[in-house]
């Protein structure tokens, strides 16, 4: 994908959208307003529940294999930045920053690769992250 995006920077938006779908950065949490039972689970007023956005991104209904990065996939309406009144006000700037960073990185360091023996590990939770990894490139 690195070579493809370096040669086709007009597809970077699609790559950013798809990577955010597959590896969301945050999960949404909500406070329970009143005691209730849901799916056999007793919830008390004041409890916090978390809705992992990664789960909705893996719904097979999005088309194709949801675990696979596919920048040609029709853009599903994922909830990585929330929905409706709960949409993150920084969603647009975040996508612009990701697009700009990737475009500039690929223009300046197009031949980077993972260092030998390095793997990329994604860690999810309330905030998603990528564990540190090493890159190398030719000067």
Task: Give the location of each predicted region.
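Cytochrome P450
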Residues: 1-139
